């Protein structure tokens, strides 16, 4: 019987095995895909390397840094400058949003309208602030909301912003408001102290985040862990003192503890005996947003300096543009660069179903329309599709998660959901890793860490213009 079985070989799953190894335990990992890393993997095509979404290696948690440094050697890391901007109506805006830059770019008339709109909502705030639209409008005013938040947010989620829970806004921008942004522009906080930006540089593996998890995979195998790729779990059946885990390939494993990074929505369908109808319905109601990236090889050495640009322009479908050469010069070839256009989609919709050739043509047309590249400078392109990339925070997601959490706590205390999809939480890479570390310590050391509290009650760096957050437990 295996002491610990881990479902998924992304950052959470591999970190769980890494932590278990420190306590003298070997694990079995079952990964449904043919490669490791999950959404943090790096794709290689014809000598070009590109991420599935960008992953800055920055955290406030020392343990996470220690794990990164244990997996990769010092010379495997680069220290890269951080730069991101918003593109809107042929102008670039600082990201995170800075009042001085935003109001200057908008022009004096529009700036006055935005400020007046902000003071209007201070007097007459939206009554119902449980959805994204009203929550943000109450803190920035309706005009700034419509300019900088509505279009991009609805691109990401594919639904009206009134159907997105306020949790999404509060998690990503926490207590920031227009007034705080203005104070930040002058580098002053409530106490009159100078605010400093916590991150203007970040660590990054030479060959992308996939380098981290590919190396972890190889080292774990050398340490004696079992890792089976293309091995998708189809059933978890509970017995007196153990579980039997069955894969689609017909393999059966007897295990004591399970760490699962499979989508939380799928867990109730997988476990036998079946849960109550409330739990099954809650799982069915958890939604995901899918994702595809079109990587274009451009016949220019430096298209722009940013790591990525958020596209708030309503006239194009692309949501964000990655500049892989800005992440690492080792990702691209000399004299050329590679840009990744990110599209937020649903499996089966028009974009997801479009063939690669047409997607490459669309991406090229949109980059040229935005004047981010010169015409006829695209040399080749590649498409990568990623299902279930983003857990959706709709108005009922929290209740659905609570129902599943309560069921697992009462009926399956030896099953530990970990990671972004495993917990249906929009976690950063470091948060996902910490859910794995804390779960292993609960098993091995008898600790009582509440995994569900990680990345819930915290002050986000976004509030002071860093765009990142750090996991804490309270």
Question: Where are the regions a protein language model picked out?
Answer:
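C-terminal lid/capping helical subdomain adjacent to the catalytic/cofactor pocket in oxidative enzymes
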Residues: 395-474
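Glycine-rich FAD pyrophosphate-binding loop
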Residues: 21-45
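Dinucleotide-binding Rossmann-like beta1-alpha1 core, especially the glycine-rich loop
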Residues: 46-124
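Mid-domain catalytic core of redox enzymes
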Residues: 23, 231-357, 361-372, 376, ...
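A short alpha-helix-loop-beta-strand transition element characteristic
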Residues: 42, 64-87, 143-147, 288-289, ...
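Flavin (FAD/FMN) cofactor-binding core of flavoprotein oxidoreductases
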Residues: 361-405, 416-417
